[in-house]
Amino acid sequence: CESTLVDDLLHGGYSRLSVLDISQTAIDFTKARLGSLASGVEWIVANVTEADFPKHAYDVWHDRAVFHFLTAASQRHAYVERVANAVRPGGHVIIGTFGPEGPTKCSGLNVQRYDADSLHGEFGARFRLIDRQKELHQTPFGTTQQFLYCFCVIGSRDACPKSATSR
């Protein structure tokens, strides 16, 4: 939980925030960093592919660097179904994964790399691809890793047209 997204959102006045991590240690670290602001966040320690989320409870789902660790099709399917259930129709989904030129391993684990079409293909027609963006992420070790971010709007179970701007 080195990401400071939750800090930035809290300082920006956002509320009704949830943070999920599989690691209690990471959650505790982030809570300590936030101090009294941590009480304004729902903290969830769980495997995202197994967690139960309330139906249509979220306006925005942001995943930076989890999805690419899901190397089994069954894990990816479980993840997508949870997102589709948890995010309200018309809600936004932002997924950040390693891009096609990103590393093949991270922290000793195999990862799945994506381009925008293959990542959107994992999510399917319910997720309308609005935009995509590649980024070179500077690691703490002084190297760079290619990331791909896809921005989607979720529709109903009925098919949504696929569209995107190119970058």
PLM features: what roles do these ranges have?
Residues 1-56, 70-167:
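Class I (Rossmann-like) S-adenosyl-L-methionine-dependent methyltransferase catalytic domain
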Residues 59:
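Conserved acidic residues
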Residues 62:
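A conserved beta-strand element that flanks and buttresses the S-adenosyl-L-methionine
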Residues 65-69:
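Short catalytic micro-motifs in class I SAM-dependent methyltransferases
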